[in-house]
Structure formats: C-alpha cells, structure tokens
A protein has these predicted regions:
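Acyl-donor-binding surface of acyltransferase catalytic domains
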Residues: 1-10, 80-88, 94-165, 304
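Short amphipathic alpha-helix that is part of the acyltransferase structural core
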Residues: 1-51, 159-194
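Active-site/acyl-donor-binding loops of N-acyltransferases
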Residues: 2, 136-155, 261, 268-308
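Conserved donor-binding loop and adjoining core beta-sheet/short helix segment
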Residues: 18-19, 23-26, 33-114, 119, ...
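Hydrophobic beta-strand residues of extracellular immunoglobulin-like
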Residues: 62-65, 214-217, 261
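A structural microfeature
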Residues: 74, 141-143, 226, 256, ...
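Conserved acetyl-CoA-binding loop-helix of GNAT-fold acetyltransferases
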Residues: 99-113, 243-248, 252-269, 287-292
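Phosphate-binding active sites in nucleotide-utilizing proteins
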Residues: 187-233, 248
C-alpha cells in the first residue's frame, strides 16, 4: 500500500474492477509498479500479486484499475481466497499522481468490494501508507519482518541431519505433488503459503529465477518430511530463504535448522554477499532461531485490517 493521501484537485478519475487483465493492461500495471518501486525503494505488490497479474482469471482475485484523464495512475488487487480471514489487498498510486486522493479512492473501493471486511498490506511500512490506513479506519494487525545477514563470513560446517533423514534437490514434475502436500501440512496455520496450488507452483517454476539446484528436499525413507527452497535475487546480490518447511511429524528434531544451514551454505557458495528471509514478528521461536544464525531485522511490512 503506497499512497500520499493529501487531497488536491486533479483530473476526473474512474475505477474499473476486472476479473482478469489483458496483456496490454498487465504491462501497464507492471510499468506502474516499477515506477513506484524506483521511488519507494520497494515493490508495493508482493511476488504472489505480481504473478496473479498474468495468466487470465484466477478464482477469488480481482483487479482495480484507477485512471485519471485516460491514464492509469493507480492499481489495487483484492484476493478473497482465505476461508477464515477477510479478503487481502495491495494498492499503489503512481508517484507522479500522489496527493490527489487516489489512494483513498482505491481504499474505499476495496472496502466496498470486500463488504467492509478487509486486510491491506503496507510493504515497507511507509508513513503515507500508515496515514491512509488510519483514514480508512484500519488498525495494525500483522508485522512481517525482512531479516538479513552477511554471507561473506558464513562458514558453518555441514549440518548433522536427524537419524534416517537424507537430502536431495527437487525434481520438477516428479516431486510436485509430494511438495504441495508437505507445504500444506507445514503451513496449515498460514493460508497464504499453505494454500499454494499446482498452478501457483507452476507459475514459480516458470520464473527466470527458478533453480531446482537450490530447492532442497529432506526424506525419511520415501517420505518427504521437510524442505528449504532458496531464491537468488541476482540484481540485488541477495540469496533468500524463500520457503522453509518441516512436516508436522518431523518437527522438533532439529531438521529445520539443518535445512536452513544447507540452504545458506548453498547461497554462500554462489558468491552472494547477503542472505534474507521473511518471518512474522509474533513467531518468537523462529525469530530467535534466525537471530542465533546471525540475522537482524532489515525492514518491516505491515498489514492493517478492519475491526472484527
């Protein structure tokens, strides 16, 4: 959520809500996101949201295009796929068109579309986004930390795996179903991750950054019990602990820490200077583990919601 909500006179605006975007509309939205990221230093829409721009209609996802004078100046995405929580949204206004109330207009449209049950991300926690959340009557609900640590001095030894556990890399097509099942079980409490489908996995496998050599699977016999999927952000020189999960039956035995170390050793071996990861601030156990591994908080994403 990125917007300066100070209202100044501007060109007449309109908001169109669509179930899917055309190729031309997708490119226009991506251009808007890039312009905003250059100004804000961070993407206003998550990786999942950007993937959902392409590929036609997706269940529970809608796109709001705000135009002024025929020009696209704002975008919002609303996802209503969580069976428990309110719909989640992300929004952005072009840096050159802020201060005209476009953010408030998009926020009001999202509230109307969601039946006034809404969660909104503010990536980076910018002050303008916090102000807009207040104007819309939203309260802080969740804090997602991005943590980082240098890899230049990472010299952890090869980890000792729990008895009977072996690790190999992901084989696309062969391991998809098993990974989706363990991912769902490991993140049953975290619908954003645990609800990933084959289509979501295929989207990621089609991305230029996907590399199965950095996708580690832990097995006990023939049973997949955990994984560490790493991601390289080549332009930024960052290696990410992209997704780390351990099946419920294998938790508590040190497998998560071992998989973390395996992934970090891999990223360090790529010559990447820095590792990063995302973790919920209220997951005290995970934050403590990562802090012991040398990670510190780099920035935060904030989620706001309507009162329930």
């Amino acid at each position: 959520m990125t917007s300066d909500d100070t209202v100044r006179p501007g060109r007449p605006r309109s908001i169109e809500t669509l179930a899917a975007l055309s190729a031309e509309q997708t490119e226009a939205v991506l251009g808007l996101l890039d312009e905003a990221a250059r100004t804000d230093g961070q993407q206003a829409v998550s990786e999942q949201g950007r993937l959902q721009l392409r590929g036609g209609e997706r269940e529970g996802v809608s796109h709001l295009l705000l135009t002024a004078g025929g020009e696209l100046v704002g975008y919002a995405q609303l996802e209503d796929t969580d069976l428990v929580e309110p719909p989640a949204a992300e929004l952005v206004v072009h840096p050159g068109h802020r201060g005209h109330g476009h953010g408030r207009a998009l926020g009001s449209a999202l509230l109307a579309a969601s039946g006034k049950r809404l969660r909104v991300w503010a990536h980076g926690g910018h002050s303008a986004a916090r102000h807009l959340a207040q104007v819309l009557g939203l309260t802080l609900f969740r804090e997602l930390r991005q943590m980082r640590r240098p890899l230049t001095d990472f010299d952890a030894p090869e980890p000792v795996l729990p008895e009977g556990v072996t690790v190999r890399t992901f084989v696309p097509g062969e391991d998809d179903a098993a990974w989706l099942a363990v991912n769902a079980a490991a993140f049953a409490h975290h619908p954003e991750q645990g609800s990933l489908t084959q289509r979501d996995l295929d989207d990621r496998k089609a991305e230029p950054w996907f590399d199965p050599a950095g996708f580690f699977l832990a097995f006990r016999g023939d049973e997949l019990v955990g994984f560490h999927w790493t991601k390289v952000h080549a332009e930024e020189g960052l290696g990410e602990v992209y997704v780390l999960g351990v099946g419920p039956g294998a938790q508590g035995g040190g497998l998560g820490k071992s998989l973390t170390t395996i992934g970090l050793r891999h990223l360090a071996g790529q010559g990447l200077p820095t590792a990063m990861l995302y973790v919920d601030a209220d997951n005290k156990a995970a934050v403590s583990v990562y802090e012991r591994l040398g990670f510190t908080t780099h920035e935060v994403d904030l989620m706001y919601r309507t009162e329930t």
